[in-house]
């Protein structure tokens, strides 16, 4: 969002004496973010960033929302007016607010405790794939309308052998989506994919490039047999996101300095021949454990399948770095590190699972089972208590 909006939003909270503002780093604490995102779903269907959650002193959510502008703009109230209304509700109708918070918390607890009796069978998975494919944009490829995201998990599901056998039309929709994305402005000349396109035809991207998206899209391209796209993504991971000290950075910024001014996408809009004289967008150097697990697995599999041992070697180097650096003083995995300094946030269950999956793929590519040694993971030391 625009910097002016962020500034005014921060000023509104700072000037109010009725709230205690706590800012959550989503990359450091995805578990906290996920919990409050789930709670916010009780109040709005438009989930995303920025997320503002109003809680009781016990941390239970009684109201939430995403974007509120600095000044009222139909149908959205001004953020300052939202603060005033929430404060009035808490002051004059506190019992109802607390009851609402308890109801949301209880509903989420029940949903989290529900365990399906059986895993979905082949028919259920094929049915899900067909339901996704029914939303295909037949004109421009992909699914749904603007904004359009290259949802690698969706494409990966549609590419599974089961779906290709049971719902071949759905698998074909995934192949068409990848082809459309690869030929569009969503993919940069150096091979990496941007975060999303603001238009239905995959134009006008948001120019940030994420490690998670590109690592997963590498596997999508690999499974689709699109060697050119796969090679481009791998080259982007190794050439741009890899950190000199080791591991892969979290993302490359969307903005860069062009002619003395910060420009959204300005670097990427220049011809490749002109980029050599420009400073490229900065890379977020945080080496996130789970995200690196995705990259390790993707590069190991791609390198093995396409005959690129250097990619496998890069995966080995990243694995060694994460297993050595992303640890606390008790030798437990942490969420991330920056410039060789480990974060204080303990690795989540997802971090452990993604890293383990990446190490299994690395072991398969190298033939070295030491990659998946249990002593490397120390999963029982993590917050997940696996």
What are these regions (language model features)?
Residues 370:
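Phosphate/diphosphate-binding loops
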Residues 3, 332, 385:
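Conserved beta-strand positions that form and line the central face of beta-propeller blades
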Residues 301-304, 309-311, 321-356, 362, ...:
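Long, K/E/R/D-enriched contiguous segments that form extended
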Residues 1, 6-10, 14-298, 302-306, ...:
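Replace the tail clause
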Residues 379-386:
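A short, hydrophobic C-terminal helix/tail in secreted or cell-surface proteins
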